[in-house]
Structures are given as structure tokens and as C-alpha cells.
Amino acid sequence: MTEKLLSEITTAQVGGPARTYIRATTEAEIVEAVSSADAANEPVLIVGGGSNLLVSDAGFDGTVVHIASTGVEELPIPACGGANVRVQAGTVWDDFVQLSIEKEWSGPAALSGIPGTVGATPVQNVGAYGVEVSEFIASVRTWDRQINQFKTFANADLRFGYRDSILKQNMVNGSPRYVVLTVDFQFTLGSLSSPIKYGELAKSLGVQVGERAESALVRDKVLALRASKGMVLDASDRDTFSTGSFFTNPIVPVSALDSLPEDAPHFPVVTRTGVFGTEQQESEEHVKLSAAWLIQHAGFEKGFGLEGDSREIAGGRASLSTKHTLAITNRGDAAAEDIFAIARAVRAGVAEKFGVELVPEPVVVNGKI
């Protein structure tokens, strides 16, 4: 139990001190730390890999519980075959993806390179290249802080949506009601990936959308694509010191297209239902826009914040990535307020130009965007 700067455990490397910091390496330690803080009416902040978190320069005046439990356990093979795997919440997500390929657990290869821990993936329903983690999650075991009991959610009970779940929707005094302890995954077996759904990835693999490829090759191509956009952590590349995509792709009523340029890209909003999201239905009332397109066409180019008048916003300490417009990066000595300032400028500019409100993807603590 110590004081710790949150900049030391977040990928954007910003954030002031935690009044109390606890690194919990087992399920029992996690439950004890959270329960004790709750019993003392102490504010609680749950941190996994710190890749989706921005804390203000003032820090957090409460208890930070750093989830550091690790381990992967193969469970008895289910009646339907395949692989059933239980993973501790603090396990590094990308390490688990690599293991899944070695074990020929088919499915998550397209989610390679995403920073953070396994426990965070169901909260956000992490996704990339047309694949979402909800497609492979069987259940999630949690600690329910409201009633001080363990609670396990089956896939269908998690209410997965676009970067959303019941775990994200329920809060206790500003932090999650349900603390993820373990995640159970169910995979089919084989060396081939799930069908490739994303055109850019399919092209790099030399296959058509809907076809499969070797999972190991999919991982290699995804890591290369992400690295080209500064989306794989690299100590020598300042573009990777970020929270990844800062804004979600806006979901708007179909009628909103009438006020946007004809060439503004839009995509169907697909709702997944049934076990593992096997049933899909397209919304007739809403569409998904491209946040990157909106940002760029509102006048914000790669590297916004580094040169010219835009440098005055954060003194060049923070900027949009020089590789793409969706990430806000720490150029070396940024404060949290510098990140927030760039975010506010971009958000206001898009709203003024297109009338669309961008929604931040990372959790923001004690800051204003």
C-alpha cells in the first residue's frame, strides 16, 4: 500500500498521484482491497493495463487497485467441442492472443496488438478489424461491490454493444460496480482464423473479405498494420504513447446523413444477439460514422498540436498522432491537461463543422473534455 503516480501505470504516461495504491496479484487480494476501501467509504479506481485511462494531473484522492492477477487455465472440454479457457483478469491481452495462436484456439488473431489486460476486454467489448471479443466470451466472473458477492455473467447477460457492456454501464460512486476477476472464453479449434471481415486486412493477407487465413499470418499482418498507425506500444515512437483511438465512431440517426457531405462514410449498426453474438441484425434507424473522417474533414490533420497556431493549445507537448487522426499522443512531457486540451479542440471543431458530438473512448478521471 503506497502512493504512486498514475503516469507510471498508464500508456499515455499522464496522471497525478494516487493517495493509496494497491497492486493486487490474486483474486483474494483484489476482493480484499476493493471491499476494504468500500467499507471505509473510500473512492476506488480500478486499473488494469492503463491503456484506456486518463487521470488528471491532480491524481486520484482515494484507493487505486491495480489488477495484476495472471494465469490461463484450460477447462474440461465442453460438450460442443472446442476449447474452454479461463483467464485471470490481469493477464496481458496480447500475450493471451499469442498463446491462443500457439494452441490453435481460433478467433482472436485479429485482436492482436491491443494494449491492456484481459479483464478490461469485456467491459469495453474490445474490437478491431471487424472482430469483437464478445464473439468468444462464454462468461465473466466478477465481484459485485453493491451487494458484496461474487457474480458470474453468461455471454447473453453481458448486453454487449459497440464498445459497451453491462459492466461498463453500472457504476458505484464513479467506478465500476462489477470488478472483473476472470474471463472464460470458448474457441473452436484450428489454425485458421475466423472469417476476415475488414477490407484493409483482407488486402494485406491476399484474401477476399469473408475468407479465412492462417491465424499466425493474420496476427503478423495486424501487428504490422497497427504499428504503421502507431497503435503498438514502442518506447522509441512517441505516437504510441496514447490511449489508442481517443473517440468512438459516432452512432447517429439515419436522418443525420442529410446534413453531412454525400461522401461522408457511414456503416450499418449491427446488433449481435444470441450466444456469442451469432445472430446479427442491422439497425434501420441508426448508422455509424467514421470519427477519423470527421476529424480530418473538420480541419484537423495528423500532428495537429505540433506546429503553427495549433501548437499554442498544448505547447507541442501533446498532439494528434503523426500517423493518423484518432489518437492523442504524449510527445514526451505532456500533462494530462495538455491531452484534454487537444481533445476539447478536436471535439469542438467537429461539433461546429458537422453538428456531431464525438464521445471519448478512454475513461477520464477528474478531467474535463
Predicted features, each with a name:
Residues 8-11, 150-328, 333-337, 353-369:
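Phosphate/pyrophosphate- and phosphate-bearing ligand-binding catalytic cores of soluble enzymes
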Residues 40-43, 65-66, 84-87, 104-108, ...:
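Short, low-complexity, polar/charged sequence segments that are solvent-exposed and flexible
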Residues 36-40, 99, 221, 294-299, ...:
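Generic non-transmembrane alpha-helical segments
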Residues 1-147, 157:
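Anion-binding (especially nucleotide phosphate/pyrophosphate-binding) glycine-rich loop
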Residues 26, 50, 116, 148, ...:
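Residue-level signal for inorganic ion chemistry
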Residues 33-37, 197-201, 342-346:
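Short amphipathic alpha-helices in soluble, non-transmembrane regions
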Residues 102, 335-342:
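Beta-rich strand-turn-strand
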